A protein has these predicted regions:
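Conserved non-catalytic scaffold segment of RNase H-like nuclease domains
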Residues: 1-82, 101-119
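Active-site catalytic microenvironments for nucleophilic, acid-base chemistry
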Residues: 74, 92, 131-135
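Conserved beta-strand -> loop -> alpha-helix junction used to position metal-binding or nucleic-acid-contacting
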Residues: 79-92
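Catalytic phosphate/metal-binding cores of nucleic-acid and nucleotide-processing enzymes, i.e., regions
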Residues: 96
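Extended, charge-rich low-complexity interaction segments
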Residues: 114-123, 202-204
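Acidic, divalent-metal-coordinating active-site segment for phosphoryl/phosphodiester hydrolysis
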Residues: 122-133
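Acidic two-metal-ion nuclease catalytic site recognized across multiple nuclease folds
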Residues: 131-204
Length: 204
């Protein structure tokens, strides 16, 4: 889906299935591998997707770390544009009462967007687009989400672990035995407990 931020408008969208021999995620997305191999113009769909990608400034996904791993393999093109994660990089307004890393479903419902299906790419994109349409501070959220980030470990005791959890840090993910989260320098300054960097800063 190609979304234009200033006008809060969906400009174009496309959905198609890539043929596959098996689908380990069938129980989640409901796509049977034989269905993916039925005759359909998937190459034309892929060409349309590549045209949308060429027009985009930023690639956004919910749980971008999962989605970006598939690009540059098989028929999917490599993506060299900035990635932005609507689950981890965007700090949604406190009045929406969302967890630090909300699901697409929870995010949609917090903005009054009805949820009628889940775990399909286009429906997830529709939910996100409708959230963006309702988000008055979208430009600020996106700009702050694109700030360089690095992985930090929270320096909290066992008794204080709730402070890290409430700040969106994850235990054992991706570092075993540690509370960690990717943060910008601005976000680090706002924390109420000390942290230590675990990697060099990088853009999305």
């Amino acid at each position: 889906m190609l979304f234009e931020v200033p006008h809060r408008a969906v400009l174009s969208q496309v959905s198609f299935l890539l043929p596959c021999d098996s689908n380990d995620a069938e129980a989640i997305n409901g796509i049977a591998a034989p269905v993916s191999r039925l005759p359909q113009p998937w190459r034309s769909g892929l060409a349309c997707f590549e045209a949308l990608l060429e027009s985009a400034d930023v690639v956004l996904a919910h749980n971008a770390a999962f989605d970006r791993q598939w690009f540059g393999h098989g028929p999917l093109p490599a993506i060299h544009k900035p990635w932005l994660c609507s689950m981890e990089d965007l700090r949604w307004p406190a009045e929406r009462q969302l967890r630090a890393n909300p699901s697409v479903r929870d995010l949609a419902l917090a903005y009054g967007v009805p949820v009628w299906a889940a775990h399909r790419a286009l429906t997830d994109c529709i939910y996100l687009a409708q959230v963006f349409e309702r988000c008055d501070e979208l430009e600020q959220l996106l700009a702050q989400g694109l700030e360089p980030r690095r992985l930090y470990r929270a320096r909290v005791s066992y008794e204080e672990r709730h402070r890290a959890r409430e700040a969106g840090f994850r235990w054992n993910d991706p570092v075993s035995g540690a509370w960690t989260r990717r943060l910008s320098e601005r976000e680090v300054q706002r924390l109420s407990f000390p942290v230590v960097p675990l990697e060099e800063p990088c853009s999305a």
